[in-house]
């Protein structure tokens, strides 16, 4: 390769702009970043180049990634640890407000400063273990300044005063106006980073300072006192200030709007020969258009604010439509998995402390309150809320112990292009001095590090998709017709044990009156914490998919406008120690006045037990960690859209379990960590149900529960069919964007198993599959007629279901799997003395015999349950059998299954296949860990090398007994010997579908004619031809091809392309037409076959068929008798 050769690379940035660079082919990735840094405005150390889902490494050359002429994506990376990890005064408390989509201010902490972890691991620092143990969390969410972000604030300390949505609207408008100010500065030629000169600062500080100062001041409660500070609603005067700011922005924008109109009026015909003039005009169009978009969002944010003049003074603002009105779920039909999202989501969790230690002398108490005014309400660059100890020095006596600084965990869900990351910021950014945050020890109910269960891939995709739609809807102000705030339901969870309390007792949540009670028998252990952590990880999707503006406590009967709340009413007794103070215990009896019906004592008997069974199945939590705790339980309030049946089911189960005794078993021990949350296994694999009592959860209730959970998890992915009746085939076709995955004769898995999979996917919905996976057999019971008809047609080929015929069909079916089995196990190590191919074939024969006999002969109400038990037992035995053959190597068994799935899914989206294999691998680990089948039970299925094969059946039954129709027996008694320029080939009989003779004494045509063709070929060819004939009978035939197509085809290909031509049998033609169209007869298939086999109807059909073909040949101008002599001979004269 010459040294002067060039390559052209296109770089696409997050603002959807593309730039093309021509560089040397030998340039490294590091040098390329430096080359483009001046054009993209991002320094090389912050650049992250992504191509086809891979991050380009700096030590490699650009040509190694084959990006010549391709498009690579550029995102701004998060530099590790740009802020001090311990102590030291923070520099962010006095920084001017900065928008998330603006350039960072010099000297201010980076937006992505501190450490981060990729989504899927959730390896959070030890502080997270302290946060999940905090009590009385409150949640509020705020849409971003331009509608493209969503902030979820989770305060895990005492209930803060509920912030009103009108104030959030005003703050949102103020932030949007700040962004417009920055754009106007750019238009006017000012520097981007000159934030101090913005006229908006004064109005923002005046409007926001009160909201920020009110929030910390109202939380300075002393022990034993109730928080009764009213909600901080904005006054109309604050609204007036925002409107004045809007007017000033419009005045500044007016001259640029005039120039904007002039440019657009002449844009149609202007030549723009001057490049500088063209670029300047293009810059004005882009910036003014962006300003108009932001201005519209600001107007939408404040347009719903109202003031009721008939109310008593002082009057305040309220909203006529909540924010959720603009953020209903929508579906982007043009997008398929993976959904690439250009939106950033910030989740901020704050918790004020259980660490009761002295603040250092240079703490925030000595800072003037004026430092608050420059700190934004919604976390942007700093993303740090003000400290609760932030007040004038006169309010903080030197001898008092002020509240410690809040600890902040900011989870930045940066779904920019394919990159998603979580950003953990656990430092005191709002304080002026360092604070000591000791890691909890095992004695405090936690460990140095806690592993949060990772969310499944499709869960994060659904969350990302949902957030995108809400952000787009909020940004555009689009109304969702008929959208109502979804109903809420309450899950009761066990309270997390406190840090320190008297032995044998635990403080329960205070009631509405402020009194506290104690419950004996509570023990300290990490089980409750891990259980709550699992609930947080499982419900974070709810918090993100259904945002709220007002955090409202209460029960499921609350009429709050919030669409999702997460509240915990566990005990607030906690203590911690610092390096210079002794341990203290502070008990707060603060009662949120909005919490009126949350129980403050023991829940109804049996509620925890039954809901633990439900949640343990659906959310992957440990039932023992839920049902075996009898202390006061925090309530988790979640929203499920459009699920009145689900709410009714919850009410029914709570009422039905009033008399169930409470479990008094001890709490789960520290060594028994709850399993991580896992989604339901994919439909492509069956798994046994968990050991749950089916009588406690009726099928109707379970169906409504599954519909609600799937609706919440899949979000807008299931928006096309909220009833839960969409079939799996329709769901996959909608996601993949193709329509031939499960169509008859489509490419993909063929033969009997492909048709069976098609039948299941067309008749089962996702709800049905989840019900089966959890032990409910009703879907199989409903599928009984279709299964019986399918096995009669495809398995037995319309013969009587006698034991002999079923065995022959099973043998013929499994013999065709020999090559697949040998290929699948070729890459793994098998026991030396085990014939794994024979072991699997004979095992499958036995299982198919049992299952087929049950499907064809069972007609009572136990059909579904027994079939499900058979399938589960077969699955466990197959796993145990092959695990034994593979020397107990679980990884080898998993790789065999995943590799087979990949081979069968070549035409399916690779992302979908990867998700199926990864989830299936996790599910297999769970199944293999609780294997109920022992090695001794499966020894009877093991076939050793050198063992004598089973005695075959008589020769008349060794091969499928071919009983050819009377019309074609003469021509099909032996294979047709065809000659061609390519050589001699043997064509299979015209009827390639094997038909089993119901009468065992009927002579077979193959036996009668085998000597005729066997004598005409060399003896060594006979077994080869017989095997080839057997294999071809199992191949799903393709549609007939024209003679013109076949005439130009080589002999070897033409041999496999021979169709059956027109179906001269009326019953066969109708049967195939019914199968192709999915039609079902009103009567049974046997009755239809008997009626169609009538000799008179058959004769009329043959006559009409020949007439139609003759008419087609006469009317076809391109038909040539010399070119198609066989057709002329076949259809001349009467039939």
Curated annotation (Swiss-Prot):
* UniProt region (Disordered), positions on chain: 76-114, 194-238, 350-407, 498-522, 552-612, 661-698, 1075-1099, 1116-1135
Q: Where is the composition biased (Low complexity)?
A: 79-100, 228-237, 555-600, 663-672
Q: Where is the composition biased (Basic and acidic residues)?
A: 1087-1099
Compartments, as annotated in UniProt: Cytoplasm, Cytosol; Nucleus; Secreted, Extracellular exosome
Quaternary structure and partners: Component of the bag6/bat3 complex.
Task: List the PANTHER family.
Answer: LARGE PROLINE-RICH PROTEIN BAG6
Q: What is this protein called?
A: Large proline-rich protein bag6-A
Origin species, per record, is: Xenopus laevis
- Biological classification of the source: Eukaryota, Metazoa, Chordata, Craniata, Vertebrata
């Amino acid at each position: 390769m010459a040294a002067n050769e060039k390559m052209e690379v296109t770089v696409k940035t997050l603002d959807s702009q593309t730039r093309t660079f021509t560089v040397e082919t030998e340039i490294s990735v590091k040098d390329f970043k430096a080359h483009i840094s001046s054009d993209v405005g991002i320094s090389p150390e912050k650049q992250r180049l992504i191509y086809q889902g891979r991050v380009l490494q700096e030590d490699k050359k650009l040509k190694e990634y084959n990006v010549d002429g391709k498009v690579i994506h550029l995102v701004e990376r998060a530099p590790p640890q740009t802020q001090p990890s311990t102590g030291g005064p923070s520099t962010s408390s006095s920084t001017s407000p900065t928008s998330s989509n603006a350039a960072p201010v010099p000297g201010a902490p980076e937006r992505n400063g501190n450490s981060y972890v990729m989504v899927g691991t959730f390896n959070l620092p030890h502080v997270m273990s302290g946060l999940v143990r905090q009590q009385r969390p409150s949640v509020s969410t705020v849409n971003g300044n331009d509608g493209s972000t969503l902030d979820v604030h989770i305060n895990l300390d005492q209930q803060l005063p509920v912030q009103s949505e009108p104030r959030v609207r005003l703050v949102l408008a103020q932030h949007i106006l700040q962004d417009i100010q920055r754009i106007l500065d750019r238009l006017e030629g000012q520097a981007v980073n000159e934030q101090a000169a913005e006229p908006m600062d004064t109005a923002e500080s005046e409007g926001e300072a009160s909201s920020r100062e009110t929030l910390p001041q109202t939380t300075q409660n002393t022990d034993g006192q109730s928080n009764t500070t009213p909600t901080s609603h904005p006054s109309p005067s604050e609204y007036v200030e925002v409107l004045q700011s809007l007017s000033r922005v419009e005045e500044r924008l007016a001259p640029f709007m005039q120039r904007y109109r002039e440019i657009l009026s002449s844009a149609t015909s202007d030549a723009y020969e001057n490049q500088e003039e063209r670029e300047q005009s293009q810059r004005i169009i882009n910036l003014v258009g962006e300003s108009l978009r932001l201005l519209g969002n600001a107007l939408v944010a404040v347009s719903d604010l109202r003031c009721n003049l008939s109310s008593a003074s002082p009057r305040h603002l309220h909203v006529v439509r909540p924010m959720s009105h603009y953020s209903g779920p929508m579906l982007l039909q043009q997008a398929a998995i993976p959904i690439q999202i250009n939106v950033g989501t910030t989740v901020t969790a704050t918790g004020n402390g259980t660490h009761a230690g002295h603040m250092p002398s240079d703490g925030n108490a000595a800072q003037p309150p004026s430092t608050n005014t420059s700190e934004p309400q919604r976390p942007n660059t700093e993303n740090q809320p003000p400290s609760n100890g932030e007040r004038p020095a006169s309010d903080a006596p030197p001898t008092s112990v002020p509240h410690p600084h809040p600890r902040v965990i900011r989870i930045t869900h940066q779904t920019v292009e394919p990159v998603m990351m979580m950003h953990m910021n656990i430092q005191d950014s709002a304080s002026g001095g360092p604070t000591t945050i000791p890691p909890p020890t095992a004695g405090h109910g936690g460990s140095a590090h806690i592993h949060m269960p990772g969310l499944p891939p499709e869960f994060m995709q659904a969350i990302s998709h949902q957030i995108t739609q809400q952000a787009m809807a909020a940004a555009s102000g689009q109304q969702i017709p008929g959208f109502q705030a979804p109903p809420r339901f309450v899950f009761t969870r066990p309270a997390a044990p406190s840090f320190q309390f008297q032995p044998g007792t635990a403080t329960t949540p205070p009631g509405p009156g402020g009194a506290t009670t104690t419950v004996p028998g509570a023990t300290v252990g990490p089980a409750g914490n891990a259980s709550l952590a699992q609930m947080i990880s499982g419900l974070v999707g709810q918090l993100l998919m259904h945002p709220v503006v007002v955090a409202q406590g209460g029960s499921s009967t609350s009429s709050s406008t919030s669409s999702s709340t997460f509240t915990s009413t566990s005990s607030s007794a906690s203590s911690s120690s610092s390096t210079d103070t002794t341990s203290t215990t502070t008990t707060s009896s603060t009662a949120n006045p909005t919490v009126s019906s949350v129980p403050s004592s023991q829940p109804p008997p049996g509620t925890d037990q039954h809901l633990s069974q439900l949640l343990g199945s659906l959310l992957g939590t440990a039932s023992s960690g839920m049902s075996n705790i009898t202390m006061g339980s925090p309530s988790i309030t979640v929203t499920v859209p459009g699920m009145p049946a689900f709410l009714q089911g919850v009410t029914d189960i709570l009422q039905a379990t009033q008399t169930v005794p409470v479990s008094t078993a001890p709490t789960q021990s520290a060594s028994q960590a709850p399993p991580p949350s896992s989604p339901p296994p994919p439909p492509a694999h069956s798994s046994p149900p968990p050991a749950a009592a089916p009588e406690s959860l009726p099928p109707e209730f379970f169906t409504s529960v599954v519909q609600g959970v799937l609706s919440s998890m899949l979000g807008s992915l299931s928006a096309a069919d909220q009833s839960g009746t969409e079939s799996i085939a329709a769901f996959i076709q909608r996601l993949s964007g193709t329509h031939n995955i499960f169509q008859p004769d489509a490419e993909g898995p063929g033969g009997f198993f492909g048709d069976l999979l098609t039948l299941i996917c067309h008749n089962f919905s996702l709800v049905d599959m989840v019900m089966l996976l959890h032990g409910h057999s009703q879907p199989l019971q409903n599928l009984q007629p279709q299964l019986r008809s399918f096995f009669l047609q495809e398995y037995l080929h319309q013969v009587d279901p006698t034991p002999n015929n079923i065995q022959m069909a099973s043998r013929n079916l499994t013999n065709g799997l020999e090559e697949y089995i040998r290929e699948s196990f070729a890459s793994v190590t098998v026991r030396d003395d085990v014939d794994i191919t024979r072991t699997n074939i004979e095992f499958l024969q036995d299982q198919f015999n049992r299952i087929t006999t049950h499907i064809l002969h069972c007609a009572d109400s136990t059909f579904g349950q027994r079939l499900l038990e058979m399938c589960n037992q077969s699955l466990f035995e197959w796993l145990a059998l092959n695990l034994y053959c593979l020397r107990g190597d679980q990884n080898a068994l998993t790789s065999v299954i995943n590799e087979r799935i990949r081979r069968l899914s070549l035409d399916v989206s690779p992302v979908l296949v990867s998700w199926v294999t990864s989830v299936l691998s996790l599910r297999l680990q769970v199944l293999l860990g609780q294997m109920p089948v022992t090695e001794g039970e499966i020894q009877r299925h093991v076939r050793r090398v050198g063992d004598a094969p089973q005695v075959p059946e008589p020769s008349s039954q060794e091969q499928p007994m071919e009983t050819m129709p009377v019309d074609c027996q003469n021509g099909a008694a032996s294979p047709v010997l065809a000659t061609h320029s390519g050589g001699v080939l043997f064509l299979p009989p015209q009827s390639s579908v094997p038909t089993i003779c119901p009468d065992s004494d009927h002579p077979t045509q193959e036996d009668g004619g085998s000597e005729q063709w066997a004598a005409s070929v060399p003896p060594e060819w006979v077994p080869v031809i017989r095997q080839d004939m057997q294999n071809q009978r199992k191949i799903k035939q393709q549609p007939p091809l024209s003679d013109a197509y076949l005439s130009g085809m080589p002999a070897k290909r033409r041999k496999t392309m021979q169709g059956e031509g027109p179906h001269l049998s009326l019953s066969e033609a109708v049967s195939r037409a019914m199968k192709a169209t999915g039609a079902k007869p009103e009567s049974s298939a046997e009755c239809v076959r008997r009626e169609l086999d009538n000799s008179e109807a058959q004769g009329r059909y043959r006559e009409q068929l020949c007439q139609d073909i003759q008419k087609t040949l006469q009317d076809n101008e391109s038909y040539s008798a010399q070119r198609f002599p066989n057709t002329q001979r076949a259809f001349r004269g009467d039939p």
